Amino acid sequence: MSDGTASARSSSPLDRDPAFRVITVTKETGLGLKILGGINRNEGPLVYIHEVIPGGDCYKDGRLKPGDQLVSINKESMIGVSFEEAKSIITRAKLRSESPWEIAFIRQKSYCGHPGNICCPSPQVSEDCGPQTSTFTLLSSPSETLLPKTSSTPQTQDSTFPSCKAIQTKPEHDKTEHSPITSLDNSPADTSNADIAPAWTDDDSGPQGKISLNPSVRLKAEKLEMALNYLGIQPTKEQREALREQVQADSKGTVSFGDFVQVARSLFCLQLDEVNVGVHEIPSILDSQLLPCDSLEADEVGKLRQERNAALEERNVLKEKLLESEKHRKQLIEELQNVKQEAKAVAEETRALRSRIHLAEAAQRQAHGMEMDYEEVIRLLEAEVSELKAQLADYSDQNKESVQDLRKRVTVLDCQLRKSEMARKAFKASTERLLGFIEAIQEVLLDSSAPLSTLSERRAVLASQTSLPLLARNGRSFPATLLLESKELVRSVRAILDMDCLPYGWEEAYTADGIKYFINHVTQTTSWIHPVMSALNLSCAEESEEDCPRELTDPKS
């Protein structure tokens, strides 16, 4: 829980006091404070914290301590109120459950032994408190409280309360050595007046002796104005200026205590009446702030011893718990270190996995790019293959046409080859016949001058060899017969030659019935008639017409 900020107040020395604090405490179970003091109690007129009850809100907060002066609770002033009014203020604050505790207090530094007890004028116990504690001086700030010291007090009480015994005074002593009271803010040069006269004197006229300040003591004006604030008097700016004008301050800012009391009596008479403090009570109120503590009763000392022992036992238990918690903390620290190392290892592994994932993603992107490139190459290859297939189809069509042409040409050439072979055979036979005829004619012509008997024998031989019947039958007209024979031979040879002489690309063939027909391999056509038969018939007719007149004229000659 954080400290609350001070509420808006009029500018005063209280606001400038470093010991003045305003805190905010969360309201949960209860305030948990035991108080003492008030204007109707001997430890007053201010209200102090006697004890912080364990389990309460202030105990959980931990900022309030026994001995702190309460200034206000939830902006209700605790200055100039009685003990009962202070309790009613706390009760009213408890009923306001919706708001947290807003507590203004002044931290006191000087305690008498036990933290729950501050210097008190009497061992009287208040209604809600334990042994009553004394109030601090109103003439100095809480952080600079002045306590008188005695050198003649014997230490007869328990060592638990050394500071309280150090300031106790006993009625049996007639004289007590006192140290002068000076403001801590003053320099050593300002203590000369205090050395001349003691700061306060004892008044042992009763069981509770009073200690009054020397009027010649010089104190800070701000401290004296703060004492007025403790009394519940809030001087205005004009009153503060008038007070400083009437009280003469030296170069150090200190004023005489007696002069300040007289001026305060004249200026703040009405305000003292409002807070139920008479003018005659101001010195007693101011003087009652430096009362030493009386000795505590034996039962209270025993009670405090028991509380101390219980506190020591609780401290030992807390120490053991602290050691256990320290061991547990060390174990937790070791576990934390192990967890940190594991976390570092996991983080490194995570970074390695992330790097591997990045590399895998990069490789995947590269593979995807290569796959896209392969697909593009495949598409290009498929397009090229389709183009090549189209070209191949065109080329195959052209090849088919060229093959068909070649086949036609081969067929025609084969036909021509066969025809040439047949013509060769026909020419060979015709040539042999012609050669035989010529040889026979030559022998006949050579032997024409031989005797007739020899000639007749040779004719018979030639006729048998050359098959010339006409020449053998008609011996009388030998030249005419020879001419006729030669014509017949020429006709027969021509018939042999012309019969097998077909035009280019023509070939004769036979059907299954043995009928001859002619095939034109160039035009892929067939014909039943010989392609040159008509031309051959015409030529034969012309020759016969020419030979007939000649045969008719030869016998006449």
UniProtKB/Swiss-Prot annotation:
The modification Phosphoserine is found at S10, S12, S99, S216, S467. Residues 19-105 form the PDZ domain. Residues 142-154 have a biased composition (Low complexity). GO terms for cellular component: phagocytic vesicle. InterPro entries: PDZ (IPR001478), PDZ_scaffold (IPR051342), PDZ_sf (IPR036034), WW_dom (IPR001202), WW_dom_sf (IPR036020). Residues 142-214 are annotated as: Disordered. PROSITE patterns: PDZ (PS50106), WW_DOMAIN_1 (PS01159), WW_DOMAIN_2 (PS50020). Detected in skeletal muscle, heart, testis, adipocytes and pancreatic islet cells. Residues 298-408 form a coiled coil. GO terms for biological process: cellular response to type II interferon; DNA damage response; insulin receptor signaling pathway; positive regulation of cell cycle G1/S phase transition; positive regulation of keratinocyte proliferation; protein stabilization; protein targeting; regulation of D-glucose transmembrane transport. Phosphorylated on Ser-99 by PKB/AKT2 after insulin treatment. Phosphorylation on Ser-99 abolishes the interaction with STX4A. Its main location: cytoplasm. Plays a role in the translocation of transport vesicles from the cytoplasm to the plasma membrane. Inhibits the translocation of SLC2A4 from intracellular vesicles to the plasma membrane by STX4A binding and preventing the interaction between STX4A and VAMP2. Stimulation with insulin disrupts the interaction with STX4A, leading to increased levels of SLC2A4 at the plasma membrane. May also play a role in the regulation of insulin release by pancreatic beta cells after stimulation by glucose. This is Syntaxin-binding protein 4. The gene is Stxbp4.
